[in-house]
Amino acid sequence: MSRGSIEIPLRDTDEVIELDFDQLPEGDEVISILKQEHTQLHIWIALALEYFKQGKTEDFVKLLEAARIDGNLDYRDHEKDQMTCLDTLAAYYVQQARKEKNKDNKKELITQATLLYTMADKIIMYDQNHLLGRACFCLLEGDKMDQADAQFHFVLNQSPNNIPALLGKACISFNKKDYRGALAYYKKALRTNPGCPAGVRLGMGHCFVKLNKLDKARLAFGRALDLNPTCVGALVGLAVLELNNKEADSIKNGVQLLSKAYTIDPSNPMVLNHLANHFFFKKDYSKVQHLALHAFHNTEVEAMQAESCYQLARSFHVQEDYDQAFQYYYQATQFAAASFVLPFFGLGQMYIYRGDKENASQCFEKVLKAYPNNYETMKILGSLYAASDDQEKRDIAKSHLKKVTEQYPDDVEAWIELAQILEQTDIQNALSAYGTATRILQEKVQADVPPEILNNVGALHFRLGNLGEAKKYFLASLDRAKAEAEHDEHYYNSISVTTSYNLARLYEGLCEFHESEKLYKNILREHPNYVDCYLRLGAMARDKGNFYEASDWFKEALQINQDHPDAWSLIGNLHLAKQEWGPGQKKFERILKQPSTQNDTYSMLALGNVWLQTLHQPTRDREKEKRHQDRALAIYKQVLRNDSKNLFAANGIGAVLAHKGYVREARDVFAQVREATADISDVWLNLAHIYVEQKQYISAVQMYENCLRKFYKHQNTEVLLYLARALFKCGKLQECKQILLKARHVAPNDTVLMFNVALVLQRLATLVLKDEKSNLKAVLNAVKELELAHRYFNYLSKVGDKMRFDLALATSEARQCSDLLSQAQYHVARARKQDEEEKEMRTKQEQEKEVLRQKLLKEQEEKHLREIEEQKKLLEQRAQYLEKTRNLLSFTGEMETPKEKKQRGGGGRRSKKNGEFEEFVNDDSDEELAPRKKKRKKGGSSSGEQGEGGDEGEGGEKKKKKRRKRPQKAAGSDDDEEQTPQSKKRQPKKKEKPAKLERTPPSMKGKIKSKAIISSSEDDSDEDKLKIADEGHARDSDSDDGPRKSQKRVISDSDSDNGNKSGSDAGSPQKSQRSDEDSDNAFARKRRRQISGSDNDSAQSRRSSGGSDNESRAASNSAESERGSDRGSDNEGSERASGNQSEQEVEKSERGSDESD
């Protein structure tokens, strides 16, 4: 079937030349015809495209190149054909550049395409086809994706359904990781043209994979294969999906798909790389290398090349060809994108193999940046940084390993690595990490704990001071090492040696020096080159004070290693300890001359200390002193430059500043060092020295004392001397003396201490002797101490150490002591005389005190006798008054008896509530009263005497009432439930003597206001004084109380308000005695009625009872007691009667008696 033809018009004629597409002539022939006939440009382009379709690309290029020059442009719209010609040729060059593997040729083709597109821009810039071609060219260049996006966008704005523009936008979105956007563009293109090629389905499948929609991706790849069975991309996509299922059948299907793709396109780099990966896991490394190399050479895409190099590198890695592996890993990292970090992981391993930890760390850091929580990477980085000297990196390692142990708590290696990092900074957590590793080994792995871990745990306990635990672990490590020696004798014997050395150090800490010495020597017998054993033996000898033996051991170490810095340092320290500054200085300078130890910090500090020490020696050469200061300062600065955190160098700088006189600056330096660490004793001492210089003696003393407590288990004579100096300066000589004596007990032969003790004794003695108030004992003690100081100074002036103090000063002080001793007799005599005077004065004072004491005793005795006499007189007066009162009561009772019998009514009595009558209750006759009172007198003071003794005076009565206040019941209480047991016991006796009631005559009704009852009480608290019993406080408002009580009382319905003021008599001790007092009260009532009957009788009664002032007052109080009885109280011992009320009631009673007459 003919594919068609094209007609070429002949010039200046109407004839044409027809060229059949199936029989196209050579390109050059066609070009000559077209040139000869001056053919229009669009015919050139059509012929060129036909040549391209037939695969004749050379003729296609020749035609288009010739058309650019010779094409006829004399027709309408020739600009569009001219642009099409340029764009078509440029698109061909772009396609060729995409396929070209040679970089130079590719660059040349891209340059030609760029030139052609630029020329086309000048003709028609915004043509859609032109813009599409140029956008595709930008995509090929890779770094012009934004320009391509803008051009595709411009086309879509003009033609929203333009399929090339949609596919271009989809490609750009996919590369920008906007997979949803890319999928949307692919879908729109597919809807616009459902007959799109398989590549559109392939792009959709890749989008579905990125969106994790694997089922849809599988369908898309399958549909692409349906449309194009030879679509390699779809086959590879399906193969990868199958391989990722990680099942045997799926893997088999995936490999078959890859094989099919390889059959279709054996040079496809993607297929080759996937097959290489498959054969790597099949351990067919030769095929891996063949396929990966083939893939590498068949692609110019760097991502593909990186994959190929990685496959090659790991195949060589697993075959332990580390040089080839390193080469390909490195090449892969050059091609790889930022997200492809597997080559960096392998390259890091190669660097570790080569010992280049720095580059290895950089590689793994790149991996960790892409995958922040990758377990293997964090573990490797932690291990690398753990061995670093940089503390920051060690902190990073600690952080990584902590994350590893959190993600995988059973990783023993990670726990051990973490413990090793923590050993230097956090011993407790290091022990915890080792404990976790040990537990995992024993419980999870079911394995024995390695001797290395046991040794490390023991060393940590040793550092913490847990010597018992450390010993246990060291012994366990030795046992494990012996057991494991069967498998690797050489290795585990070396472990045993290290553990034995540690055990010997432990015995040193336990002060078992014999055991440690034995272990060190055993190690040296087996390993004579173990230098540390020589050094420890020398250190033990040095601590015992055997400097020569120590020096021999250190020299033995130098026989093994002539340049061993520790041995030279220890020898230098021996010289410094003996104050041999020159030889010591040479030893440290020798260390610094060695290339390997030219910056040795310890040696530089020791040299600085030597120069600093020379400043303490007395010298008059100021220039020399300044040179020494500058040298020391320069050395300390050099140490700080090498190690900015060296606190000892900073402390040295502070000391030099203090020597130069910059005391404030020195104190600031020392304070900063002390803030950084409180574990350096020198800093504390230097601060205390500064305080002394600033005359802050109290602060200095506190600092010295704190330093002694914190750093020195035993008394340190040097620090004690500093403390004594501070106390001496602040004038505390006694405390200074005690401190110096402590130091003397430690170092009795120290001449400096002896000099200072003598000086303090001399000053103390001088103060005591000059003080005129000093007693004889103090003066004698001062003379004794002065003599001791004199002997000390004399001794020191002859045999003292010239290097430590001036002997002439001791001679001068001895002479001063001698002068003071020559004056001592005067001070002793003065003190003795003063002491004798004081003794005489004390004797005289004692005698005066004794006389005064005897006088006071005599006065007290006389006063006591007078009180006894007065008491006897009072008792006699009381007895007389009681007797008179009884006689009076008996007489008046006999006089009143006939009249009462006439007035007495019936046996019944009217209720108090009616308020019509008051009842008078009579008790026994006079004959029955006397025996009852006699019985009471036998038991003590009679109740009658107590009751009537209260009549001595109204003032006395009130005092007694205030002192004997009782808890009160509410006014108007109806019950007497709180009667004491005594009153209940006496009630039957009262019933045997029936009360004789007597009605008040009607003419007396409402006129008799109150009656008093004179009672006697057995209360001993009134000291046998007489008292008026006021019944106003014990009144009950209800007449029903009468039957329950055998007491005789006057019941009145008047003055109820006053009665309400009285309280309850419950619990009163007098209540139990009222039955005995009723007979006296009866006589008193009879007498009062008779007195109220006539004024003459009343006057006669008053005269008979008024034999004395006291008796007159008693009678008056008795009348007042009668008025108190009107309140209805049945407690005759109550003490609440008021004087004013009593006077008013007396007047009322008298008026009532007048009316009754």
Curated annotation (Swiss-Prot):
GO terms for molecular function: RNA polymerase II complex binding. Residues 889-1157 are annotated as: Disordered. Residues 917-928 have a biased composition (Acidic residues). Residues 1024-1044, 1120-1135, 1145-1157 have a biased composition (Basic and acidic residues). The keyword RNA-binding does not apply. Keywords: Nucleus, Repeat, TPR repeat, Transcription, Transcription regulation. CDD domains: UDM1_RNF168_RNF169-like. Residues 901-912, 958-968, 983-993 have a biased composition (Basic residues). TPR repeats lie at residues 41-75, 129-162, 163-196, 198-231, 235-268, 306-339, 341-374, 412-444, 451-484, 497-530, 531-564, 566-598, 613-646, 648-680, 681-714, 717-750. It is found in: Nucleus speckle. SUPFAM superfamilies: HCP-like, TPR-like. Component of the PAF1 complex, which at least consists of cdc73, paf1, leo1, ctr9 and rtf1. The PAF1 complex interacts with PHF5A. Component of the PAF1 complex (PAF1C) which has multiple functions during transcription by RNA polymerase II. PAF1C associates with RNA polymerase II, is involved in transcriptional elongation and in histone modifications including methylation on histone H3 'Lys-4' (H3K4me3). PANTHER family: RNA POLYMERASE-ASSOCIATED PROTEIN CTR9, RNA POLYMERASE-ASSOCIATED PROTEIN CTR9 HOMOLOG. This is RNA polymerase-associated protein CTR9 homolog. It comes from Xenopus laevis (African clawed frog). The gene is ctr9.
